[in-house]
């Protein structure tokens, strides 16, 4: 009984499963499409019909009609079927359903699936009516418009929700376009809002136009705002490449760049992996890129706040209307002073703007029209100036309705703010006056270790800058090569020094004038009074004159490093002239002079040079007295001091050597005189036999005495050669009882006779003997007297005869020691010729 019940229960359950099939109640399938239900033409589309029973056959219906059938293989039962279309066309657009069947029954239809094929008609455009930027929870109005007379517009939002809105088109008579407005919102910050629009005909609702460009709504969230910057700068020339960087949080996935004047997102940068920097590269900047930019970033945490505003200016728009920039009174201004930058143009700009390098923007001013010149200008007054104003300035013109579109820039204007640090020196090695075609190099140097120097021509707009070089002497130097000179080279120059780490420049150097000759059609004349050759201390006048009208005359000395002299001309006898007077002249003013003429209207442009005039100043150089009318520049003064020190050192060294030699010579002369005196004493004490007055040698029983006598002669001759003193020995009268030997020594300087008498012989006896000698040589005495007036220094040592007394004293005959003979030396002021002839024997 129980078994029968169980069998009946199983049969009932089995029948319950078959009853829906038999009665047509199979579950309806599910129809899907890949990749999307809205596809463009020539896209591969696959329909998937899925069920749960295990059907034998699947059928695809389009617009209510059987479109395609797929029979399943019983060996490989599956619960789905694929219907593929490799290249869909407009004919494939429509409504699709699917169904399936088993061996016994067919299922019902799936839900309706619409396949839209795009790419027909005109492409519409989509814009945010005000801005794509919207706050969280807010609404934004998007406008879709097209030239084609479509009946409908549809707006779609990408994302899992597949939001869409449909509106009837309306004709806009002002734009002659068809359009529709869509209000999108509320916008939430937890997703991206990428919108597109299409147009279609109501009679063909599944054939759409191509999609518009996407507009992504930028939601202002709560995350930290990113930073934005432009490279190479926010002021960019048209057609140049540039990059805008946006840097945000580390988890940022997408960066957005928005031009605030644009009704759509400017650019989107999707990162391959989360990062904190987005790069927006613009290969060629155009007018459309000008404007104010902000950037946003989006990540897993949502949207960030907007960045600060970056104003991008495109220049070079008005290519042929370049403004002009100048500075008054000079591009070099002392710190604390004022300057005026003058921007002008012939083109009627509404505004001028002044910019400085390394700065975002400068000041802008409305233009004013100058009716007399027809120009439009603006005056930018800056002051009091500080070192921060040093740099390069430009000005641009623009219109009020396009403030980010500027003209081509003016020429660069350098501004230099000079301070109080030590001024450098400026010189030229080619001279102050140059002929056209000569090369000119100006040298700026200082004992301060400046890193760079600047050269400025007074009245000019340019400032040249060069890095300095260090010399072995500790100077910093920079050479400015101006090339071949012309009339434009003439002027006054100054230079300045600065350190790399400071924007402040030094005080100005002394001015240096550069004058160019041959610029006036005249040649002046130059004369000198009283003579071309004058004595030191006299007054000299150089007269420069011309028959042509000349405002100023310039006097130049050849080879001088000094600035040329200038004098206003005076009219005299229908000629222009100027007299350059120099009092108390010294030999420093000797040289060749030329003069030139100049007009006040062209101060640094000279006439041709006059004929050269040679001035010679005789007399000693008064080194303690500087030139009365010319001053030496710093460079020449350094050279002069070095030369003076060198000469002084050499002179002192020579003086020391001379004193040393003189002292050594005196010491040697004294030593020789002592030796000679000692030998004379030895000779007089050791001789036993006298020598006759006539020079006949008598018997010499003592050989040592003879040897000493020969030594004495040799010593006297040696003294003659070394000391330069003349020794004139002569024999006294025979009646001299003492038999003493006399030696006459002539001094080096001629004097009158009768200066020194011997210590033994009386002055009267010596004068008597000298008078007897003079009687035989009267002519020689006259020659001697005539030589007394000559200031000639000489010394001649002449050995004549050495006489020794022959007679022995009574004491010697008695055996007593003989008395030593005496050698007398007397100074006489007579020449050698004044000695009596009988004494020379």
From Swiss-Prot:
Q: Name one GO molecular function term.
A: amyloid-beta binding
Q: Cross-referenced Gene3D superfamilies, in alphabetical order?
A: Immunoglobulins
Which residues point to the Cytoplasmic side? 664-841
Provide a GO CC annotation, any one: plasma membrane
The tissues in which it is expressed are:
Detected in macrophages, splenocytes and B lymphocytes (at protein level). Detected in macrophages, mast cells, splenocytes, peritoneal cells and natural killer cells.
Signal peptide positions on this chain: 1-24
State where it is primarily located: membrane
Q: Which positions carry Phosphoserine?
A: 684, 757
In chain numbering, motif ITIM motif 1 lies across 711-716
InterPro entries linked: Ig-like_dom (IPR007110), Ig-like_dom_sf (IPR036179), Ig-like_fold (IPR013783), Ig-like_Receptors_ImmuneReg (IPR050412), Ig_sub (IPR003599), Ig_sub2 (IPR003598), Immunoglobulin_dom (IPR013151)
* Cellular compartments annotated: Cell membrane
> Where is the motif named ITIM motif 2 mapped on this chain?
792-797
Subunit (UniProt): Part of a complex consisting of SKAP2, FYB1 and PIRB. Interacts with PTPN6/SHP-1 and PTPN11/SHP-2, when phosphorylated by LYN at Tyr-794 and Tyr-824.
- Share any extra remarks: Belongs to the leukocyte receptor cluster (LRC) present on chromosome 7.
Q: What is known of its domains?
A: Contains 3 copies of a cytoplasmic motif that is referred to as the immunoreceptor tyrosine-based inhibitor motif (ITIM). This motif is involved in modulation of cellular responses. The phosphorylated ITIM motif can bind the SH2 domain of several SH2-containing phosphatases, including PTPN6/SHP-1, resulting in the dephosphorylation of the downstream protein kinases SYK and BTK.
Q: What is this protein called?
A: Paired immunoglobulin-like receptor B
Task: Provide the species name.
Answer: Mus musculus (Mouse)
Gene name linked to the record: Pirb
